[in-house]
Design a protein with these regions (language model features):
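Noncatalytic alpha-helical scaffold of FAD-dependent oxidoreductases
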Residues: 54, 59-60, 66-486
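Low-acidity, Ser/Thr- and Arg-rich intrinsically disordered low-complexity segments
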Residues: 2-10, 15-19, 24-25, 29-37, ...
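Residue-identity detector for glycine
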Residues: 2, 11-12, 39, 48, ...
Length: 486
């Protein structure tokens, strides 16, 4: 590539490359006639091939992304769910920032593997590219109590970040349902928790540090004209090595789970505003929610939740699943990071036997969207484990699904059956189409790229920024090129 740096002259970096044996029978081909529009997101396998399979030596049935081993290096690497097998022939785990910079500078295409909790090909660099894991870099977490900020390495998981922040008497504004996901990967895809006044996880970011295509180190801070394109960036601008996040004083949360909540007569705005964070669950086997997870800050006025009865036993979001992996319920106050997620940091939420989709639309459409989905619930229910409805405050990140509008998010946890799920995904997208839904970047969707781009007013600004920071296309894989048109 002709890209060199003085710091590369030490005889070559230790990038801890792992050779991967990738066979065609384990890969999605890109010539499938029924291939989906969005960058081959969870496309059906070509005739004569086998679906991707999980490899025991790659994921050890642990937390998302845990257990990915250096041993068994001839076996394919999959995402957490096992529905995507990465086509890269090498997985690199650099042990230092200099090694990472050297690796990027000498590579034609690079994508970063976070916690593996994406369900499409957003992280796949292609057979000629390299896959990079940040897990061997120092997992630094530096809390500045005076400034109320934390600087965190990109590969650190939210569970560890939250624990360290809490030790200093501070807090993040919100967390996602799972605390086991990486910080950099989460903000890059617009991942969020719930709460009418709570922005996505990316809304807490005040500074991004990334390695660009020529191996340079670049820092972009809030206030820079490029900042709103640099946080939720799909990994298309560089390798994010560190982020600085805003913090606030420590707080406690009390979580109460409630039972049946019918759609009939539902005042969605009032229900979603009843607590700091409200998550509503339905299995679409009936016209209503089966559970409401209500998370109240103890330092804010408490509001009643008169629309449903409190649960009398600990609940799991998926009916019938054991609740021991879930966070404390029954209104017992506890630290923010032990209540805002649905799942405990020390337990495994599931073993990956699922697919996921999510669609985010303007919050005033919440009831109309619920009724549109209710009309096709007999189609949804047979392949659904659970659907979660949450709210997210508007933000200014150019590629955020919550960009410019207070948002309601419909999340679907499907069964592990790609062939059965994809037709239902298309039906869901058709039902929600009148409301201009934006799919979660890291989940299964079939929205045509042209339609998707129309829903992001700053898409042209982002593509210009990608051209500026990555003129060689080092970080633009097939997914990014096709979905964003860059």
């Amino acid at each position: 590539m002709g890209r060199t740096k003085a710091w590369q002259e030490s005889g070559g970096p230790d990038t801890s490359a792992v050779r991967l044996k990738v066979t065609r029978s384990h890969m999605f081909t890109r010539s499938v006639a029924s291939r989906l529009c969005a960058g081959n997101t969870a496309a059906l396998p070509a005739e004569g091939t086998q679906p991707p399979v999980k490899v025991a030596s790659t994921y050890n049935r642990g937390l998302p992304g845990e257990g990915r081993r250096m041993a068994g290096m001839t076996e394919p690497v999959t995402n957490w769910a096992g529905n995507i097998t990465y086509s890269a022939k090498e997985l690199h785990r650099p042990h230092s920032l200099d090694a990472l910079r050297a690796l990027v500078a000498q590579s034609a295409r690079v994508r970063v593997l976070g916690s593996g909790h994406s369900f499409n090909e957003i992280a796949d660099p292609g057979s000629e590219g390299v896959l990079v894991s940040l897990t061997a870099l120092p997992p630094s977490v530096e809390v500045d109590t005076a400034a109320r900020t934390v600087r965190v390495a990109g590969g650190v998981r939210y569970a560890e970040l939250a624990r360290r922040v809490h030790e200093h008497g501070l807090a993040l504004h919100n967390m996602a349902s799972l605390p086991h996901i990486s910080v950099a990967g989460s903000v890059a895809t617009g991942t969020h928790g719930s709460g009418n006044g709570n922005g996505s996880l990316a809304s807490a970011v005040r500074e991004v540090e990334l390695v660009t295509a020529d191996g340079s180190l670049l820092t972009i801070t809030r206030g820079d004209a490029r900042f709103d394109g640099a946080v939720t960036s799909l990994g298309a601008l560089g390798v994010v090595t560190a982020l600085t996040l805003d913090l606030e004083p420590d707080f406690e949360v009390a979580q109460q789970v409630y039972g049946q909540l019918p759609f009939a007569g539902l005042d969605f705005e009032t229900v979603s505003a009843a607590a700091y964070s409200v998550s509503l669950f339905t299995d679409w086997q009936r016209s209503g929610f089966v559970q409401a997870w209500v998370k109240r800050r103890t330092d804010q006025p408490l509001h009643d939740f008169p629309w449903a009865a409190p649960a009398t036993e600990a609940m799991h979001p998926v009916p019938g699943m054991p609740a021991e992996n879930c966070t404390q319920q029954f209104g017992v106050p506890g630290p923010w990071h032990e209540r805002l997620p649905h799942f405990r940091a020390e337990f495994t939420p599931s073993s990956g036997a699922e697919l996921q989709s999510e669609y985010l639309l303007a919050r005033p459409y919440a009831l109309d969207a619920l009724h549109a989905l209710d009309a096709i619930r007999e189609t949804i229910a047979p392949v659904l484990q659970i659907c979660e409805v949450r709210t997210v405050a508007a933000d200014s990140q150019w590629l955020s699904p919550a960009y410019g509008r207070d948002t309601v998010a419909f999340h679907f946890t499907w069964v592990e059956d790609t062939a059965a799920v994809l037709p239902v995904v298309r039906r869901v997208e058709e039902a929600l189409a009148p409301f201009d839904p934006r799919p979660h970047w890291g989940k299964v969707f079939t929205t045509p790229p042209a339609a998707l781009r129309e829903r992001y007013p700053r898409i042209d600004a982002f593509t210009a920024l990608a051209g500026e920071l990555d003129p060689t296309g080092t970080f633009r894989n097939t997914f990014v090129r096709e979905v964003l048109g860059v």
